Swiss-Prot record:
InterPro entries listed in its UniProt record: aa-tRNA-synth_I_CS (IPR001412), aa-tRNA-synth_Ia (IPR002300), Anticodon_Ile_BEm (IPR033708), Ile-tRNA-ligase (IPR002301), Ile-tRNA-ligase_type1 (IPR023585), Ile-tRNA_ligase (IPR050081), M/V/L/I-tRNA-synth_anticd-bd (IPR013155), Rossmann-like_a/b/a_fold (IPR014729)
Protein's UniProt keywords contain Metal-binding: yes
Enzyme class: ligase
Protein's UniProt name: Isoleucine--tRNA ligase
Keyword Cell cycle: no
Organism of provenance: Janthinobacterium sp. (strain Marseille)
Length: 958
């Protein structure tokens, strides 16, 4: 396709005239036909190894590294993928054009649950682990190839023949080495802690894998019976209680946690009331927050009287019976009151029941009061069922147990109120099912653990790294800061098969790691480098441990997949692609959800390994929504596939839509929006076609007119493009694309189509073919085209390449692509600033004249503007600007005659339009007094005779 050179001009296919104008043509078609042509360019880029040519051309330049956040290798790409990849491509290309060496190495995230689920669906749940791994690897490779093809079709240039994959053996090995580094530095520990747990996954979840959906649960007020009435009396300053029958009242939406209750929490500084009530004819005492007495009594349908008040701190240590203590000896235990600052009196009862196995705050509170790990009651198993040893409810799932638990509470008189409650609740992002906090033994990276070098904690290092990072948009900084400041320790371990193993040997009795763990991890990494993670599966411990093997177990946990992608600054930037890339990256770019995903995990791993962020800047984009602002989903039927858009409208339309949308918010798309984008594209394409057509008989080596020798309006056009290019490059530098598109559209439709090219047509079409006047215009157009094609190439990559193949001369287009070039260095215009000011004024006048001409035309006074003669009265700078054009003023106004006279003030200024009384020249269509004055050419005006048969007309300004 690239041999489609802009051949010397030829008359367009119109009826031959006796006096033809210079109507040149171009092989660059008016219709883009993008869906058909773009795949041909994709093939040409691949066949001619354009990406390799770009790398060769930019060797030695300063590097710009955009590190690709890896999409997950499962399923076809959707519109969100397209937005992400095209934004990255546009940024890489702008930096490349700006004089950097900007490589792009795409990557894929390959381990984890979704692929494991696919293998289970296809082959069943009972496959041997070795088969799961081999089939998962094959499946991931197949998905990578599918996605790769679609990404390439979008016009994204990159190292597609050597991407990175987190499942590459070298990456898996380097990930183990990274784990070893964190272990040696003292960040990694093993402990019992409540973690996000999905019953369907059968595994812990990362924070980024949790989403919130509405859920309906029983909300219950529950009484914990007094076990130490004397201490209650003392706390409230009473000699004796009126009755020993009483309850501490709690409120919860998780009845299933009641069997695991081990404590109650109050706030030490809040006032608590002792309330006397009669319930079912029996006097009873209730303890609850003083500020909530009225609300709780009303909710429970009770009336009562507050007989005493004390501060929460007075209740510390008082014990209460478990509600089921009288039903089964297994619940014959007491729950002490602990003080906790997280307790509030704005809802509930002001007393919080604490099940340390199923709540982070509960766990922290109980541990801080001396509870040992082996004392924590944890009856919920990994599949969501209660263990068989749990009295009354063993074998039930926690969700189906809610009803019998509430029934038993009612039976013993501890259920004060039950209502169904709708609230936002944690769900697994994969299965869309509710999850819980569940205390299990896991491996963690400690946020506040003192590392072995006695330096800053992980939290401190990461927060400092955020301060040193640039954010686009700026609000991303506060968002990431808040997440890091408040997050719990990172659960590194998962209970799955398809993932990088936490390849530890754990002592059977003590649970300690083997003393040679760092050395062993390196030996295992070397095996993984050769055979993949399968090497750990098949490893006989005796091969590495010798006689110690009988004392140790192979750890079965795998690493969180967020650790996989979060380590790519180490495994890719400094590992598999260290020759092409570099650490730290200049930019990470992903959707705004990645503040808790890839941005987050990458920051944590790099803070531990390197003491800094792996990126200098973070850029986030919003999500795609339909034309009405609704989230896209298959169920709503409002999705648009990028493949379909490319195959019908063309990828350049998709690219232009992305570039023209402010990606910092939601990106709206619909057929109607794409229709408007297509119209916008046509305007740009038609402008490019005009430029190509009118330089098709122009050879810059012979015909280029120096800027200083150009006509004034041509110098203005070059100066204006210089100013606009500077503005566009400033936007590109800060990753802003929608202002670029807006400026390009305005430039093509208003600056060129509505002014400069409109004026230029007369000179291009009617001046002598090789005249200075025409060559001056073509020289300006030649400069503008060089600049315009490169400015639009990062966005409209296919169209710019197609136009470049037509426009660029063989000596310039040595690589056969626009993408090995840099932004065009436009020539300086010595009087550029003055010309910009002057022509800004002239354009204002021209707009006024055009309005007057239109009024006369509508009234039937004239046909076209060339049928008019205009007399202007102007004052001050306006008069000076108009008068300076002399006889060329008529060309700027596109009238057959124009004159200007000076007046003293703006109030006296006027525009007078008069229909011409002269004949129309059959060639230039001007109405002139000298039409027919040449006997041999009766239909021509004097200037056309001069342009065709003489020295040509003299033009200085326009």
């Amino acid at each position: 396709m690239s041999d489609n050179q802009n051949k010397p001009g030829k008359p367009a296919a119109k009826p031959q005239s006796k006096y033809p104008v210079n109507m040149t043509d171009t092989p660059f078609p008016m219709r883009g036909d993008l869906a058909k042509r773009e795949p041909q360019w994709v093939k040409q880029w691949q066949d001619q190894k354009v990406y390799e040519k770009i790398r060769k051309a930019s060797k030695g330049r300063p590097k710009f590294i955009l590190h690709d956040g890896p999409p997950y290798a499962n399923g076809d790409i959707h519109l969100g993928h397209a937005v992400n990849k095209i934004l990255k491509d546009m940024i890489v290309k702008t930096r490349q054009f700006d004089g950097f060496d900007a490589p792009y190495v795409p990557g894929w995230d390959c381990h984890g649950m979704p692929i494991e689920i696919q293998i289970e669906k296809q082959f069943g749940k009972n496959l041997p682990t070795a088969e799961v791994l081999s089939k998962a690897r094959a499946y991931a490779n197949e998905q990578v190839e599918r996605q790769k093809k679609d990404f390439i079709r979008l016009g994204v240039l990159g190292q597609w023949d050597k991407p990175y994959k987190t499942m590459d053996f070298g990456n898996e090995a380097d990930e183990l080495r990274a784990l070893g580094s964190l272990l040696e530095k003292g960040y990694v520990y093993r402990g019992l802690k409540p973690v996000n747990w999905c019953f369907d996954c059968g595994s812990a979840l990362a924070e980024a894998e949790v989403e919130y959906q509405d859920k309906r649960d029983p909300a219950i007020d529950v009484g914990f019976p007094f076990a130490e009435p004397e201490k209650v009396a003392k706390a409230f300053g009473l000699a004796k209680l009126p009755t020993n029958k009483g309850y501490a009242i709690i409120w919860t939406t998780t009845p299933w946690t009641i069997p695991a209750n081990q404590a109650l929490n109050v706030h030490g500084d809040l006032p608590y009331a002792l309330v006397n009530v009669v319930r079912n004819g029996v006097p009873q005492l209730l303890i609850l927050a003083a500020d909530l007495v009225g609300t709780v009594l009303q909710r429970c349908g009770l009336t009562g009287e507050t007989i005493a008040i004390c501060e929460g701190s007075a209740l510390e240590g008082i014990r209460f019976k478990h509600p089921f203590a009288d039903l089964d000896p297994g619940y014959n235990r007491e729950s002490p009151i602990y003080l906790a600052t997280y307790v509030a009196a704005d809802s509930g009862t002001g007393i919080v029941h604490s099940a340390p196995a199923y709540g982070i705050e509960d766990f922290i509170s109980c541990k801080s009061h001396g509870m040992r790990d082996d004392e924590i009651i944890a009856p919920v198993m990994g599949d969501g069922k209660y263990a068989s040893w749990l009295p009354l409810f063993g074998g039930l799932t926690i969700w189906e147990a809610s009803k019998p638990i509430c029934a038993k509470l009612d039976e013993v008189g501890s259920l004060f109120k039950l209502v169904m409650f709708d609230h936002s609740y944690m769900h697994c992002w994969r299965h869309k099912t509710p999850i819980i906090y569940r205390a299990t033994s896991q491996w963690f990276a400690g946020m506040d653990v003192m590392p072995k070098n006695q330096g800053a904690t992980l939290r401190e290092t990461a927060l400092q790294a955020i301060e040193e990072t640039e954010f686009f948009p700026s609000w991303g900084k506060a968002r990431l800061h808040g997440m890091i400041a408040n997050r719990p320790d990172w659960t590194l371990s998962r209970q799955r098969q398809w993932g990088v193993p936490m390849a530890f040997f754990v002592h059977k009795e003590t649970g300690d790691l083997h003393p040679r763990t760092p050395e062993l991890l390196e030996q295992i990494a070397q095996r993984v480098e050769k055979d993949g993670i399968e090497a750990w599966l098949t490893l006989d411990p005796k091969e590495l441990l010798g006689a110690d093997a009988d004392m140790y177990l192979k750890n079965k946990d795998t690493l969180d997949v967020w650790f996989d992608s979060g380590c790519t600054h180490q495994t890719v930037l400094r590992g598999s692609h260290k020759e092409e890339l570099a650490f730290p990256a200049d930019l990470y770019l992903e959707g705004s959800d990645q503040h808790r995903g890839w941005f987050h995990s990458s920051l944590l791993t790099s803070s531990m390994m390197n003491g800094r962020a792996p990126y200098k800047a973070l850029l986030t984009h919003g999500f795609t929504v339909d034309g009405e602002g609704k989230k896209m989903s298959k169920s709503l039927g409002n999705t648009l596939a990028p493949q379909k858009i490319s195959d019908t409208l063309g990828a350049d339309i998709l690219r232009l839509w992305i570039a023209s949308t402010d990606y910092s918010g939601e990106l709206s798309i619909s057929d109607e929006i794409l229709k408007r984008v297509t119209e916008s594209y046509r305007r740009i394409r038609n402008t490019v076609r005009f430029l190509l057509s009118n330089t098709s008989d122009f050879d810059a080596a012979k015909d280029l007119v120096p800027v200083a020798d150009m006509l004034e309006i041509d110098r203005y056009a070059v100066a204006q493009m210089n100013a606009m290019q500077a503005e566009i490059l400033a936007h590109y530098k800060v990753y802003e694309f929608h202002p670029v598109v807006s400026k390009l559209q305005m430039y093509c439709s208003e600056d060129l189509g509505g002014f400069y090219l409109d004026i230029l047509k007369d000179r291009l079409y009617t001046s002598g073919v090789t005249s200075h006047a025409r060559r001056s215009a073509q020289s300006a157009i030649w400069h503008l085209t060089h600049s315009l094609l490169r400015l639009m190439a990062p966005i409209l990559s296919f169209t710019a390449e197609e136009a470049w193949a037509v426009f660029a001369s063989p000596d310039v287009n040595t690589d056969g692509t626009i993408f090995t070039h840099t932004f065009y260095q436009l020539p300086e215009v010595s009087d550029g600033a003055a010309l910009l000011a002057k022509y800004t004024l002239l354009r204002e006048v021209r707009n006024d004249v055009t309005k007057q001409l239109e009024e006369v035309r509508v009234a039937g006074g004239i046909g076209s503007s060339l049928q008019a003669e205009v007399e202007l009265k102007a004052s001050g700078d306006k008069f000076a600007a108009l008068a300076s054009l002399d006889d060329d003023l008529k060309f700027v106004l596109i009238t057959s005659q124009a004159g200007v006279s000076q007046v003293a003030s703006a109030e006296e200024e006027s525009v007078v339009v008069t229909p011409s009384t002269y004949q129309k020249c059959e060639r230039c269509w001007h109405y002139r007094a000298d039409v027919g004055s040449h006997a041999e050419h009766e239909g021509l005006c004097g200037r056309c005779v001069a342009n065709l048969f003489g020295k040509g007309e003299a033009r200085r300004f326009a």
